[in-house]
């Protein structure tokens, strides 16, 4: 197999909300890439040795004195460079052109008239009826380039942006004022393919099969004949991590499945059946429900509940790891967005989002090496790897489930009675979404237990029982979300089933809050 890291694109992040999309598109094309803060050093770029460089968009203005700049070495490295939005503007400024703020800001759909067909725009045209090639694109900018650097030509214009694209074919420098990475730019993926494959000359060998082969080889090289321990939750990341490690080291992998009593209906049995029986993994099930529930008694605050659940998990996992006296490595399902969010910026100006729980090493008392076979992969890539390894699609494409599980879906204090009722109600909700074809139309759906009683009528009698709320949302990025407009007859069917089949629930409500102002989870 060819080295899948041999050809690679470096993406410098200037803070755009779309920057990770650039990386995902390049990976989709079949080429490895990494995303770094814009203020990297020349030495770091030299060591990475990119085949091409992409400068992302960003929220700053190139007209400000302290605005971010690409390292000068970017333009001296002898590799093709593509500037996107802010990336085009800083390229123009740094190479001797001019930018200025515009009275006509462009946000949303625009049509670019192609003035010259350079290598970047080869074979691209979204308007076949026009004598002049045009591209349907997505704009999001205030500043614009007003004077080209020496050696550049205008390759695209819009009515309000005379220099919407530019190129210097001799040095293979290209700039586009629009965002090719978003799906609204119709030929965006084709444009990026032109840059990455045709201009940079990258081989498209970043495929699930090659990634698996590479990961297995690297695991073997890292751990050799040593034994590895992994906390297996049944979620996508830990499941794919488990199967990669199992393929590489077989029975030297010890999986610990901590059943905390906060899982979905029959989930513990399903995990054991899938990974123990079907895939033959060496897996230990720790039934810790009583321990978790005891620790959570009297705790009502959501953050305090999260912390306690995390603490008890670490304690239980640590006890199990000490029983495996020959284990030398801990495996984690860290994925690439975790690594990006935790990357430190040299100047402190780059936009670093948060510190992530999977990144930054282990507790001091755990004297184990760290194995992270997914740390180069985006979530969609992890799912593709899982599919190639034999995991069922319905498991890989399941809606997100929070780390604390039902601990944040039972409001207030957590009790076994509440969890048992919630499990049954939620299973009915999800089953009916599947049966009606709505499960994959919504981004996330779940049930919340409300610790209040409401009067109900059953037969000839009145009784007070608990209330649950159904929640279903539609979202692209989980940063904002709309409540899903499920059909009334479907909601009615779900409500009737829950009230009739789950003894202890007398009322079902539907949450019609968007994000913002509400969050997706209730706690």
Curated annotation (Swiss-Prot):
Pfam families: GATase, GMP_synt_C, NAD_synthase. The keyword ATP-binding applies. Residues 8-205 form the Glutamine amidotransferase type-1 domain. One of its GO terms (molecular function) is GMP synthase activity. Pathway: Purine metabolism; GMP biosynthesis; GMP from XMP (L-Gln route): step 1/1. The active site is at 85 (nucleophile), 179, 181. Residues 206-398 form the GMPS ATP-PPase domain. Keywords: ATP-binding, Glutamine amidotransferase, GMP biosynthesis, Ligase, Nucleotide-binding, Purine biosynthesis. The keyword Nucleotide-binding applies. ATP binds at residues 233-239. GO terms for cellular component: cytosol. It catalyses: XMP + L-glutamine + ATP + H2O = GMP + L-glutamate + AMP + diphosphate + 2 H(+). This is GMP synthase [glutamine-hydrolyzing]. It comes from Actinobacillus succinogenes (strain ATCC 55618 / DSM 22257 / CCUG 43843 / 130Z). The lineage of its organism: Bacteria, Pseudomonadati, Pseudomonadota, Gammaproteobacteria, Pasteurellales.
């Amino acid at each position: 197999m060819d080295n899948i890291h041999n050809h690679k694109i470096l993406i410098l992040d200037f803070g755009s909300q779309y920057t990770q999309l650039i990386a995902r598109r390049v990976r989709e094309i079949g080429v490895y890439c990494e995303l770094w803060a814009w203020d990297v050093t020349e030495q770091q770029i030299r060591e990475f040795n990119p085949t091409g460089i992409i400068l992302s968009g960003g929220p700053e203005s190139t007209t400000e004195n302290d605005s971010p700049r690409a390292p000068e070495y970017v333009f001296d490295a002898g590799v093709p460079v593509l500037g996107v939005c802010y990336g085009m503007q800083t390229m123009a400024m740094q190479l001797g052109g001019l930018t200025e703020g515009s009275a006509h800001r462009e946000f949303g759909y625009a049509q670019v008239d192609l003035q010259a067909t350079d290598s970047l725009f080869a074979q691209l045209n979204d308007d076949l009826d026009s004598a002049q090639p045009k591209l349907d694109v997505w704009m999001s900018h205030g500043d614009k380039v007003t004077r080209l650097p020496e050696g550049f030509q205008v390759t695209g214009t819009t009515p309000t942006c005379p220099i919407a694209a530019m190129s210097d074919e001799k040095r293979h420098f290209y700039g586009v004022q629009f965002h090719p990475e978003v799906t609204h730019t119709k030929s965006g993926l084709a444009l990026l393919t032109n840059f990455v494959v045709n201009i940079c000359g990258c081989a498209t060998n970043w495929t699930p099969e090659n990634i698996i082969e590479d990961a297995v080889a690297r695991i073997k090289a890292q751990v050799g004949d040593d034994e590895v321990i992994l906390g297996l939750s049944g979620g996508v990341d830990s499941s794919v991590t488990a199967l990669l490690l199992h393929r590489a080291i077989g029975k030297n992998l010890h999986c610990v499945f901590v059943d905390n009593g906060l899982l979905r209906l029959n989930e513990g049995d399903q995990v054991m059946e899938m990974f123990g029986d079907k895939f033959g993994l060496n897996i230990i099930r720790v039934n810790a429900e009583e321990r978790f529930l005891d620790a959570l008694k009297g705790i009502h605050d959501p953050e305090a509940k999260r912390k306690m659940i995390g603490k008890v998990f670490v304690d239980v996992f640590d006890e199990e790891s000490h029983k495996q006296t020959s284990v030398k490595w801990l495996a984690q399902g860290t994925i690439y967005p975790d690594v990006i969010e935790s990357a430190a910026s040299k100047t402190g100006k780059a936009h670093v989002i948060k510190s992530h729980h999977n990144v930054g090493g282990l507790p001091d008392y755990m004297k184990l090496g760290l194995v992270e076979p997914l740390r180069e992969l985006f979530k969609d890539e992890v799912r593709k790897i899982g599919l190639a390894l034999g995991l069922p699609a319905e498991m890989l494409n399941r809606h997100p489930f929070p780390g604390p599980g039902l601990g944040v879906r039972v409001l207030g204090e957590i009790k076994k009675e509440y969890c048992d009722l919630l499990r049954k109600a939620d299973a009915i909700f999800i089953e009916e979404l599947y049966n009606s074809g709505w499960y994959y139309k919504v981004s996330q759906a779940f049930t919340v237990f409300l610790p209040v009683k409401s009067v109900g009528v059953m037969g000839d009698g009145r009784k007070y029982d608990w209330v649950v709320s159904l929640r279903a949302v539609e979202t692209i990025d989980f940063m904002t979300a709309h409540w899903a407009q499920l059909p009334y007859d479907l909601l009615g069917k779900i409500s009737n089933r829950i009230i009739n089949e789950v003894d202890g629930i007398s009322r079902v409500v539907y949450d019609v809050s968007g994000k913002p102002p509400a969050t997706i989870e209730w706690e």
